[in-house]
Amino acid sequence: MQPPGPQQPPPPPLFTPNNGDFTFVSSADAEDPSGSITTPDVKLNLGGEFIKESSATTFLRQRGYGWLLEVEDDDPEDNKPLLEELDIDLKDIYYKIRCVLMPMPSLGFNRQVVRDNPDFWGPLAVVLFFSMISLYGQFKVVSWIITIWIFGSLTIFLLARVLGGEVAYGQVLGVIGYSLLPLIVIAPVLLVVGSFEVVSTLIKLFGVFWAAYSAASLLVGEEFKTKKPLLIYPIFLLYIYFLSLYTGV
């Protein structure tokens, strides 16, 4: 029986146990590195409602890219209706039309709203409508009537200020424009009775007096005192000229 041979020394370790500040662990003694990372639940409070963020959202916010997730709130000013954007109040325009067509104080309308709260679109619509029924195949009448409305109102405004009236040009422009409504009302009547000269003339005079009274009762206040005829007369002449543009005289 042969004696056992010399035993071979064990192989050197793969890692040195201690190397300065680091400790190396052999692969045989290492723990299984598999596992999972729990993502904290992050909730946003948006308008009283809590919304759970995803891991991608959380990652972007932690890296300073949260601005990519921001959503702009709609500005209520950008969602206004078109009429409101253009400052068009149909109820207000309708009320002013009734005030002009029924100028008698006994009817109970607050007629001063036509002067104290002027608007542009209502008078412009009235003037354009009057221009359309006054065409007679000539589109230049439209621009001419608008020109007379603008500069005629300017003349009345300057005269009112010279006489001591406290009135703005926008107020005069609105009152003169709205007061064209009586001439629009008598237009279809003139088509019917146009062959009767006397009746037609009376209706024309009635329409002019109606329009001039509606405008003068709003523009000529108590501040004019004895100077009222000086302002009523040019208003009356202005509506005579408007009527002449319609009749073609």
Curated annotation (Swiss-Prot):
Region (Disordered), start-end ranges: 1-40
Lumenal topological segments: 138, 193-200
Compositional bias (Pro residues): 1-15
Polar residues compositional bias, start-end: 16-26
Source organism superkingdom: Eukaryota
Statement: the UniProt record of this protein carries the keyword Endoplasmic reticulum: no
Matching InterPro entries: Yip1/4-like, Yip1_dom
Recorded topology in the membrane: Multi-pass membrane protein
Signal sequence, renumbered to the chain: none
Locations listed in the record: Golgi apparatus, cis-Golgi network membrane
TM region positions: 117-137, 139-159, 172-192, 201-221, 229-249
One BP annotation, GO: endoplasmic reticulum to Golgi vesicle-mediated transport
Keywords: Golgi apparatus, Membrane, Transmembrane, Transmembrane helix
Principal cellular location given in the protein's record: Golgi
The protein's role, per its UniProt record: Involved in the maintenance of the Golgi structure.
Family per similarity comment: Belongs to the YIP1 family.
Protein's UniProt name: Protein YIPF4
Organism: Gallus gallus (Chicken)
